[in-house]
């Protein structure tokens, strides 16, 4: 694996670099060391989290979700090297093609339902963490905030955060969340319980 220079994305937990792996275009995500932690503890935490993220990506893929193919997990460098997915973020696509909102939102709802049916939550469902490929597939990326073996509360939080993020990123797209939940209900076992939990979260004011 060889990285190609400056980071293309930076977050609180890590940075993403363009790279190559055995001649294939790739991206490498490196977990950032935290100077305020004891070095041994910091390495242990970063190693656990990089392994967890890789496992979630693989589990999501096994559940029928389009995710990047993982090429390598380096527990020394605390990095994941994975497929460089071709396409554009859903955020950019909807900004440029708002007339496609209903179709894309239904695609989002179906894929989230498949995640939740497999007891996986993403933890940061935004249209910036979804890529629309040239083949029309929805690829979900960045599972760094995700978890598995989840309950209804986690699923409700996933949907609530998506609703808030969608409203903020795409305020001019009407009925978006409705399209998402309609598709979600068709695919998700026990969907109404999750939607009831979303309403409960709203009523509690927990994420408002």
Where are the predicted features?
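Conserved structural core of kinase catalytic domains
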Residues: 46-50, 61, 65-108
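Regulatory N- and C-terminal appendages and interdomain linkers associated
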Residues: 1-10, 23, 95, 99, ...
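C-lobe/activation-segment region of protein kinase-like
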Residues: 139-208
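Conserved protein kinase catalytic/activation segment
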Residues: 129-140
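Catalytic-loop of the protein kinase fold
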Residues: 117-127
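ATP-binding glycine-rich loop module of kinase domains
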Residues: 4-51
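Conserved hydrophobic alpha-helix
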Residues: 60, 111-115
